[in-house]
Amino acid sequence: SPGIPKKADLIFKINQKGIRLSSEIEFASEFTDAKIIAITGSNGKTTTTSLIYHILKNDDLKVGLGGNIGKSFAKQVADENFDYYVLEVSSFQLDDIQHFRPYISLLLNLSPDHLDQYNYNYEEYALAKFRIAENQENDNYFIYNRDDEMSQKLLQELDLRVKKIPFSMKEKLHE
Protein backbone atom coordinates (compact mmCIF):
# COMPACT_ATOMS: atom_id res chain seq x y z
CA SER A 1 0.00 0.00 0.00
CA PRO A 2 1.32 3.47 -0.82
CA GLY A 3 0.09 4.38 2.68
CA ILE A 4 2.92 2.39 4.25
CA PRO A 5 6.24 4.27 4.04
CA LYS A 6 9.09 2.41 2.33
CA LYS A 7 11.21 3.12 5.41
CA ALA A 8 8.73 1.47 7.81
CA ASP A 9 10.18 -1.25 10.03
CA LEU A 10 7.73 -3.83 8.67
CA ILE A 11 8.79 -3.16 5.08
CA PHE A 12 12.46 -3.30 6.08
CA LYS A 13 11.96 -6.72 7.70
CA ILE A 14 10.03 -8.07 4.70
CA ASN A 15 12.78 -6.91 2.35
CA GLN A 16 15.46 -8.45 4.59
CA LYS A 17 13.75 -11.83 4.34
CA GLY A 18 13.60 -11.59 0.56
CA ILE A 19 9.80 -11.69 0.49
CA ARG A 20 8.34 -10.19 -2.68
CA LEU A 21 6.28 -7.07 -2.15
CA SER A 22 3.65 -6.39 -4.77
CA SER A 23 1.52 -3.32 -5.30
CA GLU A 24 -2.13 -3.68 -6.21
CA ILE A 25 -1.49 -2.63 -9.81
CA GLU A 26 1.29 -5.19 -10.15
CA PHE A 27 -0.80 -7.97 -8.60
CA ALA A 28 -4.01 -7.26 -10.52
CA SER A 29 -2.24 -6.84 -13.87
CA GLU A 30 -0.97 -10.42 -13.60
CA PHE A 31 -4.58 -11.69 -13.75
CA THR A 32 -5.95 -9.85 -16.77
CA ASP A 33 -5.38 -9.86 -20.51
CA ALA A 34 -7.10 -6.49 -20.89
CA LYS A 35 -5.15 -3.60 -22.35
CA ILE A 36 -3.95 -1.25 -19.63
CA ILE A 37 -3.61 2.48 -20.17
CA ALA A 38 -1.62 3.86 -17.23
CA ILE A 39 -1.24 7.56 -16.50
CA THR A 40 1.31 9.12 -14.16
CA GLY A 41 2.91 12.51 -13.63
CA SER A 42 3.22 15.13 -10.95
CA ASN A 43 0.08 17.03 -11.96
CA GLY A 44 -3.06 16.34 -13.99
CA LYS A 45 -3.28 12.57 -13.48
CA THR A 46 -6.88 12.44 -12.27
CA THR A 47 -8.20 14.78 -14.97
CA THR A 48 -6.36 12.99 -17.77
CA THR A 49 -7.28 9.52 -16.50
CA SER A 50 -10.95 10.51 -16.21
CA LEU A 51 -10.95 12.08 -19.67
CA ILE A 52 -9.44 9.00 -21.34
CA TYR A 53 -11.86 6.74 -19.46
CA HIS A 54 -14.89 8.78 -20.58
CA ILE A 55 -13.70 8.90 -24.21
CA LEU A 56 -13.40 5.10 -24.29
CA LYS A 57 -16.65 4.57 -22.38
CA ASN A 58 -18.54 6.91 -24.73
CA ASP A 59 -17.24 4.83 -27.64
CA ASP A 60 -19.04 1.83 -26.07
CA LEU A 61 -15.83 0.04 -25.11
CA LYS A 62 -15.79 -2.20 -22.05
CA VAL A 63 -13.52 -0.14 -19.81
CA GLY A 64 -12.71 0.05 -16.10
CA LEU A 65 -11.36 3.02 -14.17
CA GLY A 66 -8.90 2.37 -11.35
CA GLY A 67 -5.60 2.98 -9.65
CA ASN A 68 -5.90 6.06 -7.47
CA ILE A 69 -9.45 6.77 -8.67
CA GLY A 70 -12.50 4.68 -9.36
CA LYS A 71 -12.88 1.18 -7.96
CA SER A 72 -10.06 -1.08 -6.85
CA PHE A 73 -8.23 -2.37 -9.91
CA ALA A 74 -7.84 -5.82 -8.31
CA LYS A 75 -11.55 -6.03 -7.46
CA GLN A 76 -12.49 -5.07 -11.01
CA VAL A 77 -10.17 -7.72 -12.44
CA ALA A 78 -11.76 -10.30 -10.12
CA ASP A 79 -15.40 -9.26 -10.65
CA GLU A 80 -15.66 -7.63 -14.09
CA ASN A 81 -14.79 -8.49 -17.66
CA PHE A 82 -13.28 -5.35 -19.18
CA ASP A 83 -11.24 -5.11 -22.36
CA TYR A 84 -9.45 -1.96 -21.16
CA TYR A 85 -8.42 -0.46 -17.84
CA VAL A 86 -7.50 3.19 -17.46
CA LEU A 87 -5.37 3.58 -14.34
CA GLU A 88 -4.11 6.60 -12.46
CA VAL A 89 -0.74 5.52 -11.08
CA SER A 90 1.42 7.25 -8.47
CA SER A 91 5.18 7.05 -8.05
CA PHE A 92 4.58 5.04 -4.86
CA GLN A 93 2.61 2.42 -6.80
CA LEU A 94 5.44 2.16 -9.31
CA ASP A 95 8.21 1.78 -6.72
CA ASP A 96 7.95 -1.98 -6.31
CA ILE A 97 6.77 -3.12 -9.73
CA GLN A 98 8.60 -6.00 -11.37
CA HIS A 99 6.37 -7.05 -14.27
CA PHE A 100 3.68 -4.34 -14.64
CA ARG A 101 3.46 -3.62 -18.37
CA PRO A 102 0.79 -1.24 -19.61
CA TYR A 103 -0.15 -1.29 -23.28
CA ILE A 104 -0.01 2.51 -23.23
CA SER A 105 1.74 4.55 -20.57
CA LEU A 106 1.50 8.31 -20.29
CA LEU A 107 3.90 10.51 -18.31
CA LEU A 108 2.29 13.94 -18.18
CA ASN A 109 4.94 16.03 -16.44
CA LEU A 110 7.50 16.06 -13.65
CA SER A 111 7.99 18.54 -10.83
CA PRO A 112 9.65 18.13 -7.42
CA ASP A 113 6.97 16.34 -5.38
CA HIS A 114 7.02 13.75 -2.57
CA LEU A 115 10.78 14.22 -2.35
CA ASP A 116 10.74 13.15 1.30
CA GLN A 117 10.06 9.61 0.01
CA TYR A 118 12.95 9.82 -2.46
CA ASN A 119 15.85 11.01 -0.29
CA TYR A 120 15.05 14.61 -1.31
CA ASN A 121 16.40 13.77 -4.75
CA TYR A 122 14.37 15.01 -7.71
CA GLU A 123 15.99 12.62 -10.19
CA GLU A 124 15.24 9.63 -7.92
CA TYR A 125 11.57 10.71 -7.89
CA ALA A 126 11.59 11.15 -11.69
CA LEU A 127 13.10 7.69 -12.14
CA ALA A 128 10.25 6.26 -10.05
CA LYS A 129 7.78 7.84 -12.48
CA PHE A 130 9.70 6.43 -15.47
CA ARG A 131 9.26 2.92 -14.06
CA ILE A 132 5.86 3.02 -15.75
CA ALA A 133 7.67 2.25 -19.03
CA GLU A 134 10.47 -0.04 -17.87
CA ASN A 135 8.73 -3.32 -18.78
CA GLN A 136 7.14 -2.10 -21.98
CA GLU A 137 8.30 -3.56 -25.28
CA ASN A 138 8.24 -2.32 -28.87
CA ASP A 139 4.57 -3.28 -29.22
CA ASN A 140 3.65 -0.82 -26.45
CA TYR A 141 3.45 2.97 -26.37
CA PHE A 142 5.00 5.55 -24.03
CA ILE A 143 3.53 9.05 -24.40
CA TYR A 144 5.64 11.74 -22.78
CA ASN A 145 5.89 15.50 -22.41
CA ARG A 146 8.67 16.74 -24.66
CA ASP A 147 8.58 20.13 -22.93
CA ASP A 148 9.69 18.56 -19.65
CA GLU A 149 13.46 18.91 -19.18
CA MET A 150 13.87 16.02 -16.73
CA SER A 151 11.91 13.71 -19.02
CA GLN A 152 14.17 14.64 -21.92
CA LYS A 153 17.28 14.00 -19.80
CA LEU A 154 16.11 10.59 -18.60
CA LEU A 155 14.98 9.51 -22.06
CA GLN A 156 18.58 10.04 -23.20
CA GLU A 157 19.92 7.93 -20.32
CA LEU A 158 17.41 5.08 -20.07
CA ASP A 159 17.19 2.11 -22.41
CA LEU A 160 13.45 2.00 -23.04
CA ARG A 161 12.34 -0.48 -25.72
CA VAL A 162 8.86 1.00 -26.05
CA LYS A 163 7.55 3.13 -28.94
CA LYS A 164 7.91 6.72 -27.73
CA ILE A 165 5.34 9.36 -28.66
CA PRO A 166 6.04 12.94 -27.57
CA PHE A 167 3.54 15.72 -27.03
CA SER A 168 4.29 19.41 -26.63
CA MET A 169 2.49 22.60 -25.76
CA LYS A 170 5.41 24.71 -27.02
CA GLU A 171 6.19 23.34 -30.46
CA LYS A 172 4.56 21.57 -33.37
CA LEU A 173 5.77 17.99 -33.55
CA HIS A 174 6.10 15.99 -36.74
CA GLU A 175 4.82 12.43 -37.00
What function would you assign to each model-found segment?
Residues R161, I165-E175:
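Short, intrinsically disordered, charge-balanced linker/junction segments flanking boundaries
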